[in-house]
Regions:
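GNAT-family acyltransferases
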Residues: 1-119, 129, 133-149
Length: 149
C-alpha cells in the first residue's frame, strides 16, 4: 500500500483556535468521548458526511475504548489521523475530526467531523478551520469533506 502521508511529513499534533483545540484522540479520552457521541447520535447522523454512516451505533464504553485505541494506532502508524475536539477552557470533549485515505477515489484523503449536539453552533466553524488547515498544513492535493451551508 502507498503511504498515506510522506515519511518526511511532520504530522500536526495540535490545532488551537479560540473556539476549540484539536489533539490526537487516544484512550485517555474514552469517558468524555463516549459521553459526547452517545448524547448526540441523532445530531451526528444529521451532520454532513454522516447521513449514511453506520456509526455511531450502540457500543459499550469498553468497545469505545478499543475503537479509540485503533484510532491511536492508526495515528502512530500514519495510516489515518483522528483528533479529539476539546473546549479550550474546560478541556471537555466536544467532537472529533477524522482524516483517512479514500481508496479508489480521485481524492487524496477524506475528512469527517462532528460536534456534540450541545455545541452544534461550532460545526460550521470547525469545518471551515479544518478545511483551511488541510489545505495549508497537510500534503494533500484534494480532500473530500462534506461542505456546510
Amino acid at each position: 500500500m502507498d503511504e498515506f502521508v510522506p515519511r518526511d511529513f511532520d504530522v500536526p499534533r495540535r490545532l488551537e483556535t479560540p473556539q476549540f483545540v484539536l489533539e490526537p484522540l487516544d484512550p485517555e479520552h474514552n469517558d468524555q468521548d463516549y459521553d459526547a457521541w452517545t448524547s448526540s447520535r441523532e445530531h451526528i447522523h444529521a451532520t454532513p458526511g454522516w447521513e449514511d454512516s453506520s456509526w455511531p451505533r450502540e457500543m459499550t464504553p469498553e468497545e469505545n475504548r478499543a475503537d479509540l485505541q485503533r484510532h491511536a494506532d492508526d495515528f502512530r502508524n500514519r495510516t489515518g489521523f483522528t483528533y479529539t475536539v476539546l473546549e479550550p477552557a474546560s478541556r471537555d470533549v466536544i467532537g472529533c475530526v477524522y482524516i483517512y485515505p479514500l481508496p479508489d477515489s480521485d481524492y487524496d484523503a477524506r475528512a469527517l467531523s462532528w460536534v456534540r449536539a450541545s455545541h452544534a453552533q461550532l460545526d460550521t466553524p470547525l469545518w471551515r478551520v479544518v478545511s483551511e488547515w488541510l489545505a495549508s498544513d497537510w500534503p494533500f492535493g484534494s480532500v473530500e469533506y462534506a461542505p456546510r451551508t
